[in-house]
């Protein structure tokens, strides 16, 4: 028996649930990530100092730093890290943004593949095309319109099921 409420084939924007596919595309295109760094690439984080250090380490391993990130700045959601930054007179930063792990992995793949790093969030960029290919491969779903997520990354419209 099949049952549903509403339209299970309605097109939605998957947003953060796409992070595993974005991480897969990054690794397939040369991002070398330890298990811990891969976990941060495939899921959001709270901006703890440990999380920021992991994203920074991915960037440093490719010769880049925080200035290469194209995600917004944010205050850490982790309270001890937030209050430490405030006490030190520091402002919000990109490494504290909850998608910085994913963005660091994106940049690692760009460096490994010889792709432009400035435009890594452009929907036509080879890395973003690889992300869309991974989404289609693993979901078996068609992709509709492309929107831009809050972190600046392209996000496809796709059916819920």
Language model features: what each stretch is:
Residues 2-3, 161:
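Short intrinsically disordered, low-complexity coil segments enriched in acidic
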Residues 14-31, 50:
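Active-site SXXK
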Residues 3-21, 37-39:
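Short active-site loop at a secondary-structure junction
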Residues 36-160:
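Active-site-adjacent helix/loop patches that line small-molecule binding or acyl-intermediate pockets
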Residues 1-2, 139:
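Active-site-adjacent bridging/hinge elements
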């Amino acid at each position: 028996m099949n049952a549903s409420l509403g339209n299970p084939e309605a097109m939605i924007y998957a947003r953060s649930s796409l992070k595993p596919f974005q991480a897969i595309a990054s690794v397939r295109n040369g991002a070398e990530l330890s298990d811990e760094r891969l976990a941060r690439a495939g899921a959001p984080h709270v901006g703890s100092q440990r999380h920021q250090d992991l994203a920074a380490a991915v960037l440093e391993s490719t010769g880049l730093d925080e200035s290469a990130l194209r995600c917004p700045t944010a205050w850490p959601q982790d309270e001890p890290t937030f209050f430490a930054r405030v006490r030190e007179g520091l402002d919000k930063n990109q490494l504290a943004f909850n998608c910085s792990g994913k963005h660091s992995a994106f940049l690692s793949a760009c460096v490994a593949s010889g792709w432009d790093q400035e435009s890594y969030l452009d929907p036509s960029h080879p890395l973003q095309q690889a992300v869309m290919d991974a989404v289609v491969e693993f979901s078996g779903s068609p992709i509709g319109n492309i929107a831009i997520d809050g972190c600046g990354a392209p996000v496809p419209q796709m059916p819920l099921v």
